[in-house]
Design a protein with these regions (language model features):
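Walker A/P-loop NTP-binding motif of AAA+ ATPase domains
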Residues: 1-114, 118, 130
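C-terminal engagement/docking regions of AAA+ P-loop ATPases
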Residues: 57, 113-125, 135-194
Length: 194
């Protein structure tokens, strides 16, 4: 991966779920995992090759599980909190996701407002539930039916935002394991004072 990035520099190397690769070595029972992390850190540091012209970004839902060595200067030394989409963002996601679906009379703004704290994945789930409802109705009388606002409102009653559980965990880390201020943005978003 690093070799390919170096061959194509300048480039951005984005690693999703970086915690799967950069979990705390002290939590690992097998040495193979520690060796993998050590190798990754050497590549990240450009020990044997230059990483000039490569911007390396990582994403995780659990930054508190990253090995502290990953957060040293020159590595993944900045944590940027990306909150769930706001109302306008949710409306835009709804419009985008429903663009090629059979719909009629959707009040996107109303649904976006009611879908507070929904992530993009939650909005996908919401739409899937609405589609399932329409499929069931279509099987009953054999006629295809477009998705409407009521279908999405019904789907909202069946799906809760997945971010709620994450915020409970994040709040605990931000309140009680935040000496360096890495999670202050989470507290600000949640309107909690330290």
């Amino acid at each position: 991966m690093f070799e390919l990035a170096r061959e194509n520099a300048p480039c951005v190397l984005f690693i999703d779920e970086i915690d799967a690769l950069g979990a705390s070595r002290s939590d690992m029972k097998q040495s193979s995992g520690r060796h993998l992390i050590n190798q990754f850190l050497q590549e990240l540091d450009g020990i044997n090759n230059s990483n000039e012209g490569i911007l390396i970004l990582g994403a995780t839902n659990t930054p508190w599980n990253l090995d502290p060595a990953f957060r040293r200067p020159g590595r993944f030394d900045r944590i940027v909190f990306v909150p769930p989409p706001d109302e306008m963002g949710r409306e835009a996601i709804l419009r985008l996701k429903l663009k090629d679906k059979p719909v009629e009379a959707i009040d996107y703004r109303s649904i976006a407002k009611k879908a507070e704290h929904f992530s993009g994945a939650d909005i996908d789930a919401l739409i899937d539930i609405a589609i399932e409802l329409k499929l069931e109705a279509s099987f009953a009388d054999g006629l295809p039916k477009p998705i409407n606002t009521n279908d999405l409102v019904t789907a909202l009653k069946k799906h809760k935002p997945s971010t709620q559980e994450w915020f409970i965990t994040a709040k605990n880390f931000a309140m009680f394991a935040n000496d360096a201020g890495l999670y202050d943005d989470i507290l600000t978003y949640m309107k909690i004072k330290k």
